[in-house]
A protein has these predicted regions:
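Intrinsically disordered, low-complexity proline/glycine-rich segments
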Residues: 1-89
Length: 89
């Protein structure tokens, strides 16, 4: 089972800097990343302003799908995730 992605900790090419969820769900002391969370720009073209694409289909935070380790940003980079907090798909 993949680890949950955390804002300000995990990366998908650049650091996930999410602002989409309203700050209610945490893992390892950091906000859980959700669908459409922005990723820090790390180049040009699709790498300039990517967002996360949640692979989970059944786990939500405030009605928004949760991002897990291995989910992709719109630039194609896979996200890292927690080594000890897991959520289902």
């Amino acid at each position: 089972m993949p680890g949950v992605c955390r804002v300000g900790v995990d990366v998908a090419g650049g650091t996930i800097i999410g602002v989409v969820q309203n700050g209610t769900v945490f893992a390892n002391g950091s906000l859980v990343s959700v669908n459409n969370d922005p990723v820090q720009g790390h180049g040009v073209g699709p790498h300039a302003g990517p967002v996360m694409i949640a692979g989970s289909k059944n786990v939500f935070v405030n009605g928004i799908l949760v991002c897990n380790e291995g989910d992709l940003a719109t630039c194609g980079h896979a996200a890292s995730g927690s080594s000890n907090v897991f959520v289902g798909d």
